[in-house]
Amino acid sequence: MLSPKRTRFRKQHRGRMKGISCRGNHICFGRYALQALEPAWITARQIEAGRRAMTRYARRGGKIWVRIFPDKPVTVRPTETRMGSGKGSPEYWVSVVKPGRIIYEMSGVSEAVAKAAMEIAACKMPIRTQFVISG
């Protein structure tokens, strides 16, 4: 699963997801792409599940690019602990995705295969997405 090799700080604030994505909202590498329509945190597990599903469907043909990276640690407190005594420990990593952000890109396959593969990957995502073609 994806995670940063090292970070400056172990824990981060939760932050806010307002507005639309101003970066990573154009197709750069492939011909087809999956674009987010809603804001959300997408976990490293969800990214990996979508990537695997697309790879399996496309078989040998095609190349896949993952355009998001989980660089935000999410802390979780142990169950049945009292309030106070600091913040919980980092449990998993998420990528902050805003509307318009490209999640996956694909090329080297037909449009029908790419669309079907992207739909399978979209089912693994916690948000609504759309299939985009470059050009």
Swiss-Prot record:
A Pfam family of this chain: Ribosomal_L16
Keywords: Chloroplast, Plastid, Ribonucleoprotein, Ribosomal protein
GO cellular component: chloroplast; mitochondrial large ribosomal subunit
Example GO biological process: mitochondrial translation
Listed GO MF terms: rRNA binding; structural constituent of ribosome
Localisation per UniProt entry: Plastid, Chloroplast
CDD domains, per the entry: Ribosomal_L16_L10e
Recorded family membership: Belongs to the universal ribosomal protein uL16 family.
Subunit relationships: Part of the 50S ribosomal subunit.
Protein name: Large ribosomal subunit protein uL16c
Source organism: Phalaenopsis aphrodite subsp. formosana
